[in-house]
Amino acid sequence: MYRLISKYQADKILQMLKEELKEAEGALEGKVDWKPLPEKKESKVYAVDGSQGKARLSGTIIYTVASFAFGNGKSARLVYTNAMTYNHGISDQIIRLQMETLENKLGALVGNEEHMILMDGTLTGSLTRPPVYPESVKGITTLLDTLEKGKPEELIRDFVERLDEHYLDLEKRLAEERELYSGVILADEVIDEYSEFYKAMEGRDIVNYDGALKRLRDALKAEIPRSEIMKIAEELDEYTELKTLTLEEARNTIHVVLGYLEYLYSLEKLLQRELIYIAKSFYNRKITSKLGINLLDVPFIDAYLVKTHGKELPGYCVIYDPERAEEKKKIAHRLPRILRKYFPTVQRFIEIGVPSAYIRTMEGGIIYLLQSNTSINDELIAKLLWHESNGYIRPLQRAHEGVKIEQKAFRAELEALMNYLKKKDKELRVFIKYGRSPLE
C-alpha cells in the first residue's frame, strides 16, 4: 500500500493551520456575542428530510424522490417515481427540485400549528439556489416573448389555482394514509393540459442573449472606459443566438416553468409554519469578514472561546436578525417580476434576508448554523433544545434514517420494474439497458 500523505505535505498543512491560528489570535479582540443556552422548554416538532435514488439507463433516467417526517405524532411520507429522457443540462436538477418540493410539501402539511418544523440545510439555500433556476427564468422569459399578451399570466394563475386544490387533496389523503405514492407532483400530471400554450409557442423565434450578456458583464467587471463598453454594446448582436422553437422544446419550457412554480408554491406554504433550518456543513465568514481576516467563522469562534473561557463552550450567537439590522442582507436571487404577487412571503425573505445564528449544544460539540423565518432568541432555542441529546437534534436524525433510499432496495425495485417493462413490450429494451450509477 503506497502512502497518500508525505511528511513534507503533512508539515505544509501544519504550517498553514498554524498561520491561520495566528491570524485568528491577532483578531480575537473582536467580540463574539456568545450567549449561554437557555433551559429546555417542552415543545412539539416534526423533522423533515429528503432522499433520491436514480439509475441512468440507455437514454433514460428512472428515479425515485422521497420525503419523510418524524416527530411528535404519526410519521408521514411522500414518494414519487418517474422516468425521463436524459437531458445532460437539467435532468439531475429537475430530480433535486422535485425532492426539495416534496420536503417542502410535507413540512407545510404535517402536524398542526403546535408543531415547529425542523428542516435539514439552510433557508438561504432554498431561496438562492433553487434547482433549475436559470432554466426556469429563461423559460418564463420565453413565455413572455412568444405568447400573446396576458397568456403567461393566465397560465401562471391557472396553475397556482390548481396547486391550491392539490394541497387540499394532499392534506386530506395524508390524514388518512400517512404514506402517499401517487399524486404528489402536480406539474408532471397536468403538463399535457397546457398544450394550447406550448402549441402556440411552436415555430416562434427566440433570441438567446447568454453570450452577449457574458461579454457585457466581463467588460463591466474589467472597468474599461465607457466608450469601449458602448462599442461592445453596439456589437452584441454578434454574440446572440436566434432559434426557432420546436413543439418538444416549447413543451419542455412549459414543463420546467410548472415545476419551478410548484417548488415556489411549496416554499411559500412552508414559510407559513414556524421553521428552524439546521445545517452542519457550511463555510460562512459572517463574523470574520467584518474583522478583515481570511478565516471561516467556526474555527474563529472556537479560538475565541478557548482564549476567553478556556474551553469550547456550549451556547449560541445571533449573526443576523432582519428585525434589528440597519442594513438588510438581501438574498442574491430575484423572483421574476411576474411571479412576485403569487409568492409574497418568498419575496419578503429575499428582500430582508434570513434570521441566522450559530449554536453549540454541548461542550466541544459541533457548531450548527441555524436559520428561521422568525427571530432567533432564547424562546426559540429553548424549544429546539427539548429535542437535543448529546449534541444532536434527534428528530432530524430519525428523519434522515427514515427517508434514506438504500442502494440494495433501490436495485431490487429497479430490477423488478425493468422486468415488468420488458415483459409488457420487448422493444422497450433499447431504453432500459446499460444501467449505471444506481444511487446517489
Predicted feature residues:
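Long, contiguous domain-sized segments
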Residues: 1-43, 95-440
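Acidic, metal-ligating active-site segments
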Residues: 50-92
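Short hydrophobic beta-strand that contains or immediately precedes a catalytic carboxylate
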Residues: 45-48
